[in-house]
Amino acid sequence: MAGRKEEASQCTARTSEGFEGPNARASNMRVEFPFVNERSSLFGIVSRPVAKIILERKFIQWMYVDSGADITLIPLSVGKLIGLHRTRKDRLERIFGVGQSSVPIVIKRVHMQLGKTRFQARLAWSQIEDVPLLLGRIDVFRFFDVTLKEKAHVTVFTR
């Protein structure tokens, strides 16, 4: 969410106990995140679903919730911040998005946390910068029922 971190960082998570600060944790099985408003060149201001994810137990990042993405995606710099590095065993793969443009990636397994739920998940570590942070389905959505409430402008993760 390069260039949009400011707006997203102003969001707070809400649990069933009410709104909490940006570093607070949900204490039960339900976590809500308000959508963020961003400018679209086609549609003006649009509301997009995001979630606060902790990567490798230390790095807090807002990610777009993308139910159409098979796998979570992070840019090169975020991978470096959480201590990822390429090894000889890593295979350089390519993933394709809208318009069939490809992105070079390496699949890595990392520790993630959403609310109080901690888990390991595979993610696609992009070898370029110009990609959004996407929270994809593989190894993440199996822990939660994910509901995008368009009218209420919130994303709800229930366990």
Predicted regions mapped to residue ranges:
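Pepsin/retropepsin-fold aspartyl endopeptidases
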Residues: 1-159
